[in-house]
Amino acid sequence: MLGRPTPGLRSGASRVRGVVACAACVLALTGCAGEGFGVGEDARKGGSLTLALDRPPGSLDPALATGPQARLVAWQAYIAPLTLRRASGQEGTEVVPGLARRLPAISDGGLTWRLELRPGLRYSDGSPLRASDLVHSLRRVRALDSPGKRLFAGVDSVEADDRRGRVTYRLRARDGAFAQVLASTYAAPVPARVPLSDQGGRPPPGIGPYRLARVGGQLVLVRRRGFRLPEVPGANVDRIAVSVEPDPERRARRTIAGDLDATVGSLPAQRLPDVRSRYAERYDESAGLSTTMFALSSRSDPVDDVRVRQAVNFAVDSEAFGRVLDGRLAPGCTVLPPKVSGYREPDPCPYGDPAEPGDLRQAATLLREADAEGARVTVGGGPGALDRAVVRSFATLLRKLGLRARVVRPGVPAQATLLHLRPVVPDPRAYLRALRGLDPQLARAARRVRADPDPERAAEDWATLDADLVERARVVPLGYDEDSTLLSARIDSANCFRAHPVFGADLSSICLE
């Protein structure tokens, strides 16, 4: 039947070229999952499933969608001009064309970025994509004071040519990570008629494998049949009904029983050994972008002495803290997680293997040399129950070393502060920005590296900054938070699950048996 072009596809001769490109993309993606269970060509299409999140996603307006739950859902409905490759592991942080024909043309010493959009693209409501919609979307991010506003702070101006389908961004300074910004859901377009107000209650039309709908007050992802872009494969399941179940035991029990088809979020620590052994074929744990650590302020005694900071690093048992965090921590000894540019695995870690118990004897020796036994140290963190438990455990460890540790209220400055770093884009500077108070020169060095147009050289410089923070014991890395997904027996886990390092479970990859 003739009608308007199929969403996500080109028309005429361009459509033929697009289909060839899509076929190549599917072949390239088959079997390349580093985490997850793989995505095969024989994935079954159709059917419906139920998904439980561990907490409400908040606003699903792409200008505002920020938390892990919101971005997991929004990524399926709002593709940006660029996007991250639909793959697991390090490959999933690679920027590829999304709504744009190709990667940006960069000129003027890195200050001008020009994109050309694919022709014939339409939103989920059938309206055509226009270049000026991207200008409107950036205006919304700024007008709504979105958490994504900071990502676009370096944009001086943006111009659109609807006739040619071109968008030009002009930056105030070179930014080697701007491609990551253009691949975030904050950069995804919505029609120019969408108001400059939060539309999360009724998510606006977008372009992606799914469209978001509200059915009887419940969030539902509805597959866009025929959708496909060269770097964004179409979805498998027709309909995904999303609910919120904060009780981890109930989520696990209902998924194992088949009352739920998938659950995203932590499971009870006491249930993990059983799940990992009995349901290994449908349970996935993947380290994402989040790093957990204690930042050590060196502005006051005794933490201003590097020997005290080193002593604390030697004493830490990352596995023990992982148990406090419900078993969702992969031990590590860097600020940058493994899937972010600039990560280099230390060999060996400067303060011992993070998967082994801490070296309390070496820690005690350093404290004696620093004459710090009995010194007062304050410890702080966030208000959440898990944060409070980690802070208390850390204070107990310091007391065991002979320090007089005191836990302060959330928000009160402390000499040792628990941090969970999870930027919305895999940009090394975002991690180091959170630590700029530890070293006045860190922010300047990070700006210099981010402006470097050579990505390989920049990655080496990020690694150097990371290693310097760790070796000087400015931080106490505990490890990398893991995202977990449990699937029911209805899901074809052998062929149909991909864990993305930035967005978590890729819902478009899931299919039924």
Predicted segments with their positions:
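N-terminal lobe/hinge region of extracytoplasmic solute-binding protein
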Residues: 52-108, 139, 205-206
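Gly/Pro-rich hinge or "lid" segments in bacterial periplasmic/extracellular proteins
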Residues: 87-90, 181-234, 239
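Aromatic- and charge-enriched surface segment that lines or borders ligand/interaction sites
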Residues: 102-146, 165-168, 254, 302-304
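Surface-exposed binding/hinge segments that line
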Residues: 112, 116, 149-194, 213-214
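Ligand-site clamp/hinge motif
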Residues: 226-274
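Periplasmic-binding protein-like
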Residues: 299, 303-341, 469-474
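Structural transition elements
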Residues: 327-369, 386-389
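Long beta-strand-rich cores associated with HINT superfamily self-processing modules
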Residues: 485-513
